[in-house]
C-alpha cells in the first residue's frame, strides 16, 4: 500500500508561549487559477493607516497575497490568507475594482499542473479590510509596519499593490468626507 500524502499547515500561534501550532491533514488542495491581494487598514485620528509586510523569502514589501484553493471565491481566499499570514479576522471587507493579471510562472508547476495549458496569466483580485486586531506574522513574513498612504506607496515593491492602495485610499477618504 502506497503512503498517503499529508499536508502540514500552521493553525496559529499560541498566545501564551508563542509556539506555532501545526495541523497534519490528509487533504490536498487544488490551487485555483487566481491570486488575491488583501490590504489591512485602520483609521487613526482620521487618517487611514495601512499595514505593509516584508517577505521572508524576498527582500520586498507588499500586502497580504496568496491564491485560492479548490472552489474558494476570491473573498473567501482573501479571508483565509489574511488569517494565515496575519493572524487576524475582519468583518469589514471592501472589494476593490483594481484588477491586475500576473504570469502563471510565479506559481510552481506542481501547483498549476491541473490548469488548462493555455493559461498564461491569472487575475489578482484586490480587497481592503479593516484591521483592529494586532497582526501576528506567519513565517512568510519577517516584519510588518503601519504606514500612511504616502509612506506605504513608497515602500511597496509591486505596481499592482500601489494601484490597489490608491483605490482603497480614495474610497476611505470619500467615506470619511461623507461622515464629516
What are these regions (language model features)?
Residues 7-9, 16-22, 26:
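Short, positively charged and aromatic/hydrophobic N-terminal segments
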Residues 29-49, 70:
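Conserved N-terminal beta-strand and adjoining loop/helix that marks the start
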Residues 33, 63, 120-124:
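Short connector loops at helix/strand junctions that flank enzyme active sites
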Residues 40-42, 54, 130-131:
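Residue-level signal for short segments within beta-strands and strand-turn junctions
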Residues 47-91:
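Conserved Nudix-box catalytic region and its N-terminal flanking loop in Nudix hydrolases
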Residues 87-133:
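Active-site segment of metal-dependent pyrophosphate-handling enzymes
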Residues 124-166:
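NUDIX/MutT-family hydrolases
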Amino acid at each position: 500500500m502506497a503512503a498517503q500524502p499529508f499536508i502540514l499547515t500552521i493553525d496559529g500561534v499560541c498566545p501564551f508561549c508563542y509556539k506555532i501550532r501545526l495541523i497534519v491533514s490528509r487533504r490536498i488542495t487544488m490551487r485555483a487559477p487566481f491570486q488575491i491581494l488583501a490590504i489591512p487598514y485602520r483609521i487613526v485620528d482620521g487618517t487611514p493607516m495601512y499595514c505593509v509586510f516584508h517577505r521572508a523569502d524576498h527582500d520586498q514589501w507588499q500586502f497580504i497575497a496568496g491564491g485560492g484553493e479548490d472552489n474558494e471565491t476570491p473573498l473567501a481566499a482573501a479571508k483565509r490568507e489574511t488569517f494565515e499570514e496575519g493572524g487576524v479576522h475582519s468583518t469589514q471587507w471592501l472589494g476593490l475594482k483594481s484588477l491586475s493579471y500576473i504570469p502563471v510562472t510565479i506559481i510552481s508547476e506542481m501547483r498549476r499542473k491541473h490548469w488548462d495549458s493555455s493559461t498564461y496569466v491569472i487575475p489578482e483580485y484586490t480587497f481592503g479590510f479593516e484591521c483592529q486586531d494586532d497582526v501576528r506574522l506567519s513565517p512568510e513574513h519577517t516584519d510588518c509596519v503601519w504606514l500612511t498612504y504616502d509612506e506605504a506607496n513608497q515602500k511597496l515593491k509591486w505596481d499592482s499593490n500601489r494601484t490597489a492602495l490608491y483605490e482603497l485610499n480614495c474610497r476611505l477618504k470619500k467615506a470619511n468626507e461623507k461622515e464629516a
